[in-house]
Swiss-Prot record:
[2Fe-2S] cluster binds at residues 82, 84, 102, 105. Inhibited by EDTA. Keywords: 2Fe-2S, Dioxygenase, Iron, Iron-sulfur, Metal-binding, NAD, Oxidoreductase. This is Terephthalate 1,2-dioxygenase, terminal oxygenase component subunit alpha 2. Residues 41-144 form the Rieske domain. Signal peptide: none annotated. Its EC number is 1.14.12.15. InterPro entries: AhdA1c-like_alpha_C (IPR043264), Rieske_2Fe-2S (IPR017941), Rieske_2Fe-2S_sf (IPR036922), Ring-hydroxy_dOase_2Fe2S_BS (IPR015881), Ring_hydroxy_dOase_asu_C_dom (IPR015879), Rng_hydr_dOase-A (IPR001663). Disruption phenotype: Not affected by disruption of tphA2II, however the tphA2I/tphA2II double mutant no longer grows on TPA. SUPFAM superfamilies: Bet v1-like (SSF55961), ISP domain (SSF50022). The gene is tphA2II.
């Protein structure tokens, strides 16, 4: 493996080398140290594979994965890679099956990922076949540990990663339970191609500072302003975070107008304001909660729009974002209608999220030739802890704290 040339400067996580988004050797190391290392990768929703034989194909970083429920009702996950010549075992995005068979040479696997059959293993009419010493039990795709929390299915290649509850920590667990406290149903999906390194999008998710500055819809229609009540929670590892706020019409002030900030534009009006008319369903009054789990999971509640996002690296300068929109299984018809309408707030062409799909590409293009220079991430100081305000980059610094630990790039004492 080629050596990375990433150079970190300073004694804090307030300076991030632009080369971290463009160095291919570093990206190769991410696959081994992060995605196949001591992390829990989000794989799918438990409700997406409800019955025995139901499966989905997905990825842990670049590694293709099969997630399947067996007759014992347990969920199993293994590499989507035939032990013979490396072809994909399952080609469909989802389905139901009693077993899996590779199309290339018809090697077969059960729903726990065990190799159960080799075509013509004994040869034909006494000729050919596998040697007598060949043992199917010693061959097969790598298997992942599986953990389920609040209906979210996670997988890990590591035997050393702590339990999912310990990995998340109590505050993040509580905030996931707040949203996923009862059964959910999938009500929509999008897959979005992003023209940037995966870390630029995950920084964006954790960046409470940008939300009301980049997104005109947020600010103009008062869904999210830094003057509103809210805060940021960062777990001890730094890798997981929650940003939350509450709509407060009385919190509107002239601070955006005084600074001539583009995102506050009173000239814009909605022809159909019913988009913003929802219903109260959370007793704490929080109208926006964005939660992330390292290395690539997001759970959102924006008004009544609930969704999970899965971020996957695809190359040094591109990534994939899978959106899964959710409703509760006991939603009324009117509640489901509201969720579907408010789904237009986010996604590839969402009134809010459209800009997030573009701005990472602006950075990726802007840092060309600047690998030895640094991004400045100093809003709110140099710490990586929780904050009572959202005019801060503390959770972005937290991401880099966790990233550097997994990558063996910690600050030297």
């Amino acid at each position: 493996m080629q050596e990375s040339i990433i150079q970190w400067h300073g004694a804090t996580n307030t300076r991030v080398p632009f080369g971290i988004y463009t160095d291919t050797a570093n990206a190769d190391q991410e696959q081994q140290r992060i995605y196949r290392g001591e992390v829990w990768n989000y794989l799918c929703l438990e409700s997406e594979i409800p019955g025995a034989g139901d499966f989905r194909t997905t990825f842990a970083g670049e590694t293709p994965i099969v997630v399947v429920r067996d007759a014992d009702q347990e969920i199993y996950a293994f590499e989507n890679r035939c032990a013979h010549r490396g072809a994909l075992i399952a080609l469909e995005k989802s389905g139901r099956t009693d077993s899996f068979q590779c199309v290339y040479h018809a090697w077969s696997y059960n729903r726990q990922g065990d190799l159960t059959g080799v075509a013509f293993e004994k040869g034909v009419k006494g000729q050919g076949g596998m040697p007598a010493s060949f043992c199917k039990e010693e061959h097969g795709p790598r298997k992942l540990r599986v953990a389920v929390f609040c209906g979210l299915v996670f997988g890990s290649f590591s035997e050393d990663v702590p339990s999912i509850e310990d990995y998340l920590g109590p505050e993040i667990c509580e905030r996931i339970e707040r949203v996923l406290h009862k059964p959910v149903e999938v009500i929509g999906r999008f897959t979005q191609k992003l023209p940037n390194n995966w870390k630029l999008y995950f920084e964006n998710v954790k960046d409470s500072y940008h939300a009301s500055l980049l997104h005109m819809f947020f600010t103009t229609f008062e869904l999210n302003r830094l003057s509103q009540k809210g805060g940021v929670i960062v777990d001890e590892s730094g890798g997981h975070h929650v940003s939350y706020s509450m709509i407060d019409r009385g919190a509107k002030d002239d601070s955006y107008k005084d600074q001539a900030i583009r995102s506050d534009n009173e000239r814009y009006r909605l022809k159909d304001p019913s988009l913003l008319e929802g219903f109260e369903e959370f007793e704490d009054g929080v109208t926006l909660q964005i939660l992330s789990v390292f290395p690539g999971f997001v759970l959102q509640q924006i008004q009544n729009s609930i969704a999970v996002r899965q971020l996957l690296p695809k190359s040094i300068s591109s990534s994939e974002l899978n959106w899964t929109y959710l409703g509760y299984a006991d939603d009324s018809a009117e509640q489901r209608k509201v969720r579907l309408k408010q789904a237009n707030l986010i996604g590839p062409a969402g009134f809010i999220s459209m800009e997030d799909g573009a701005v990472g590409g602006f950075v990726q293009r802007g840092i060309a030739g600047a690998a030895n220079l640094d991004a400045v991430i100093e809003m709110g100081g140099d710490h990586e802890g929780s904050s009572e305000g959202r005019a801060t980059e503390t959770s972005v610094r937290g991401f880099w704290k966790a990233y550097r630990k997994h990558m063996g790039q910690e600050m030297q004492a």
